[in-house]
């Protein structure tokens, strides 16, 4: 991202803007507003036809219909003012160290910092390399289906990101914390070179949230250590996650195994019921797969025992394995409605593979106590 030594040019004048336009822009850039450590980053920059916010780790800019002078405005107070007043027009007068905001008969005077203090950012078009163009709804679904498995607390920083691997006309989204892995494949309609980019979980979840409200496409690009996503006039930029990502394709076992099929909602409900008696010391649920159904059992000295049965739609092969119910629920909640779940388990010590629609997951078993 840009350093604080880079400055913007500014000229004194005023601003007239529709409140709904400004409210929408503030909501768009909210996730990138900085904290107390750098007071200038608690402001939003308005100028050059955009509203911008950055915390130096992520930057969001949103196009607005405004070509007036540059100004920094405090995000929190501006949001509160727009939320408390209603009018067809917001008038902002710019002074040397303050601004006035007028909405209808109400007026506020706020201290401001020079717009030149806001960190500038730019990437030459020649430096940008296309990664993929993905329909916004598919992008949001892909991120939702994998991001829960990333580990943002690990000392292995790479595990705190979501890998986007592009090859052979598809983009594969992957996340793992070392104990589970999630994968989702999306077809792309753009001819690009094969690539693998590791996106920070926070940034890619922000992009997905914005994409969920768009009917267009998400254009992903890389530029050195920067990753850039563009969605209908909104640009999100972030640093690439450093570190070596696991060889995730090796996690999916190559074996001959028959999967058992169950209704996703029934499997989710059964797992939640069985997990009621689990604890931090006894967190596992034992899944016993038979031709009669899936029996779920849990036990802890402080909370008691549970026994639940989940019916099946098709039987694969018998197996018993102990899994973390949180991991199972996370996978099932991320899958699309209406799709059954396939459970591929072979024994108590081997990884369990889950499939539902376009979602793929691997969960490592827990040791029997």
What does each model-identified segment do?
Residues 1-369:
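Structural preference for solvent-exposed beta-strand-turn elements
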């Amino acid at each position: 991202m840009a350093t604080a030594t880079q400055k913007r040019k500014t000229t004194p004048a005023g601003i007239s803007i529709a409140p709904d336009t400004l409210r929408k822009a503030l909501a768009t850039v909210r996730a990138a507003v900085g904290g107390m450590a750098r007071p200038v980053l608690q402001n939003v920059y308005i100028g050059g036809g955009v509203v911008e916010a950055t915390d130096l780790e992520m930057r969001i800019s949103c196009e607005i219909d405004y070509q007036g002078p540059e100004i920094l405005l405090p995000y929190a107070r501006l949001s509160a003012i727009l939320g408390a007043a209603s009018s067809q027009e917001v008038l902002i007068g710019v002074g040397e160290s303050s601004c006035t905001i007028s909405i209808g008969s109400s007026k506020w005077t706020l201290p401001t910092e020079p717009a030149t203090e806001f960190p500038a950012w730019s990437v030459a078009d020649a430096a940008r390399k296309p990664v993929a163009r993905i329909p916004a709804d598919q992008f949001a679904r892909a991120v939702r289906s994998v991001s829960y498995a990333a580990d943002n607390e690990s000392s292995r920083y790479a595990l705190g990101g979501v890998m986007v691997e592009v090859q052979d006309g598809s983009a594969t989204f992957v996340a793992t914390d070392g104990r589970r892995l999630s994968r989702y494949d999306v077809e792309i309609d753009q001819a690009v070179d094969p690539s693998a980019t590791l996106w920070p979980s926070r940034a890619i979840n922000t992009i997905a949230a914005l994409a969920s409200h768009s009917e267009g496409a998400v254009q992903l690009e890389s530029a050195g250590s920067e990753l850039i996503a563009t969605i209908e006039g909104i640009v999100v930029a972030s640093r690439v996650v450093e570190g070596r990502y696991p060889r995730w394709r090796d996690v999916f076992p190559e074996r001959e195994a028959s999967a058992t099929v169950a209704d996703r909602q029934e499997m989710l409900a059964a797992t939640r019921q069985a997990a009621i008696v689990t604890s931090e010391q006894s967190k596992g649920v034992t899944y016993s797969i038979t031709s009669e159904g899936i029996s779920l059992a849990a036990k802890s000295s402080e909370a008691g025992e549970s026994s639940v049965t989940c019916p099946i739609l098709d039987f694969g092969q018998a197996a018993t394995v102990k899994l973390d119910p949180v991991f199972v629920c996370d996978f099932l909640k991320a899958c699309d409605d209406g799709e059954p779940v396939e459970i591929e388990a072979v024994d108590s010590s081997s990884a369990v593979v889950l499939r539902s629609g376009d979602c793929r997951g691997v969960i490592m078993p827990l040791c029997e106590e």
